[in-house]
Amino acid sequence: MCKIFTSRAFLVSVLGALALLAIGFMAANSTLSVSSIISAFFPHSLLSKPKTLRAQDLALPPLEIGDLVFRRGDSLESVIISQVSHHHYTHLGLVISADPLLIIHATTDDNPSTQNQVIISPLDEFLFHARSIAIKRLPLTNAQQESIALSARAEQGRAFVIAEGSAALYCTTFVESVLAPHIALNLVYDEVNLPTWSGKYLFPRVFFDMPKGRLIYERRL
């Protein structure tokens, strides 16, 4: 292999550029994920999976339906989203069952058999891609929690779409659409201006920083 590719800085810069191109490609209604596009160009040895959290290592408090679950992932896609949004967390899910603990989220490739759609993940599956996790509790009544769980489950299998406006369905817009009928959120979309990716998008940071709700747990590697 050419010596230049042994430089981590060079590799990160190349992967970063490719990731931005991939995100732009996905925004143009591609069915491919950023990770799959990058993997097609680089050997697995260069993209080896870093250490992630395990359920048995977490001292989670009892969770409730409607809890927001934030994740920083283990992929370059997560690094790019973190840089663009200026925030640690890059993915968002919603608890729809406390026992067993189930998290619903819109994702590209968490589960190889159900790519680019809204899926329901047990905690272990959600953590498989997590280097950090945080949980925020919203002020919800029991009736609101039950309604949220029902409406969220009805969305399972909907296609993941990076876009602007009503056509969008990615992790944060999915959670927004489920919660909005039950609780005032007042979320502000961020303007993105990059060569291959531009427009107004909703990042996990907005949910994390909003005054409504309280942080009940956080763990970072």
Locate each region found by the language model.
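N-terminal Lys/Arg-rich, disordered targeting/topogenic segments
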Residues: 1-6
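Activation targets extended, charge/polar-rich intrinsically disordered C-terminal tails
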Residues: 7-14, 20-35, 162-221
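N-terminal accessory segments that precede or flank the first globular/catalytic domain
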Residues: 20-96
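Lumenal/extracellular "mature" regions of secretory-pathway glycan-modifying transferases
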Residues: 61, 116-119, 143
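Short amphipathic alpha-helical segments, especially helix-boundary/capping motifs
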Residues: 66-69, 124-126, 148-153
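Glycine-rich catalytic cores of cysteine/serine-nucleophile enzymes that process amide/ester linkages
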Residues: 71-134, 160-169
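Active-site nucleophile-His-acid catalytic modules used for acyl/amide transfer and hydrolysis
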Residues: 77-78, 130-192
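Short secondary-structure transition/capping segments
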Residues: 116-117, 146-153, 205-216
